[in-house]
Amino acid sequence: MIYNFPRKKRKQITNYLTFSSPNPFSIRVETPGWDGKLYYSTDTKRWVEWTGNEVNATEADGIYALYFSGTGNTKIAGGSSYKWTLNGSSISCTGNIESLLDYETVAAGHHPTLADSCYSSMFSGCTSLTTVPSLPATTLTDSCYSYMFSGCRSLTTVPSLPATTLARSCYSSMFSNCTSLTTAPSLPATTLTYSCYSSMFSDCRSLTTVPSLPATTLTDYCYNYMFRGCTNIKLAISKSREYDKEYRIPKSGNGVTATRALDNMFMQTGGTFTGTPSINTTYYTSNTIV
């Protein structure tokens, strides 16, 4: 169905995701996972309800682009069966991811409701994705971002993650196997949840920054395997010219651990210390701490 919105309605759709590339590309979803409506456009004026069928970007001034927006959604993906497929190269995605849930709520300055597994595996394996959208939600739900960008091997940076209210497995494996990722976001949450950061950056071999971790009360599996295989993350037990920055879990204060909370957190990393760190113990790193 084609939607040529009247002027007043059209003006409201200023909140959307933009996919763009200097090269031709297309987007499809084999099994749609959203529970409301999604629309796509090639010019931000003429919107078509989308059922997941393959849509091709349109070229203007040397740039190919597609735009997506939504209404009445509480989830967009929900696991690997519902992931989006991007065919092309050097594809950038910009805008507020929440515009896919409900653009009117975003336009009003609010956060739409997130269901469990809302964006889980959405872009998993999208090796052509170079830039990801903003993720402004401050209150998360179970597995909402799990595996969202897993295997996105062209990503070098990621957006800020401002959430302070976490949920079970919310960031689990979110950026795993993003082999070009160099910079981690800060992680401001002080209250953790079960498996919240488990394997979040595993196998990110280009990662050279580590987030400080302020939470003093750990939860079961919260940090396990978090940096496994990050060969450019380097920790040591003793300070040296190379390992000159203090790194501690928690960042300050006295922490309380939990079942397997720190298991193999630094397994197969590149420093002289690897494996499972101890809580309330100062280590030293050569990396930048964010």
Model regions and ranges:
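Structural signature of tandem-repeat unit edges
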Residues: 52-57, 77-115, 124-142, 152-168, ...
